[in-house]
């Protein structure tokens, strides 16, 4: 009985810590940045109880030795509609704390994802987005990605290659390449909490890659927990920590994801 009591207390403490961490990240820091690792999975269910609408709130805070980068942040509200097993559309509002406004929406994204291959252990999808810039000196952007997923016995490996091209402004001729890997371990480490290794690499312009010291690389660990699992109130929470690998990257970033289906 005593062991069960301690196990229950530890499980409850983990849940409570996760909730307070999210509240702390969301409201205590003044926030300017954005991480997302897309995967080729289409959010769609044939269950009549699910309307195939999905909502995600995510963001991250940068901790950096440079004063202009320290405690900067960026949040995203994403709305997803799954139309069938092959196709979904996404709408994103990017919310940032800018110098001339306490709350601004510097970017709006209109996205489409289509799945081409959906085998037992391998998925491949393409992703296209038109990114509308709302700030005066910013450029609209076309973003497209090739997304892969390999399923192994003990883990799932997602990796995506993203291409970003400004379609107006002085940098409109440049296309930037980014890489987003994620390894998700199937077996929970404790109390239905799963571990993941994730990161992002910005190689610069594909016409002439930046040298390593001028690239941006961040990698680290994350944990995922599903609350109220298999109930109408089910919600996913992910918290991650990324470490910059070179001087051009942010020293550290704290990331959160909250997902809910309807």
Regions found by a protein language model. Give the residues of each.
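Transmembrane beta-barrel domains of Gram-negative outer membranes and organellar outer membranes
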Residues: 31-171, 176-262
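Cleavable N-terminal export/targeting peptides
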Residues: 1-38
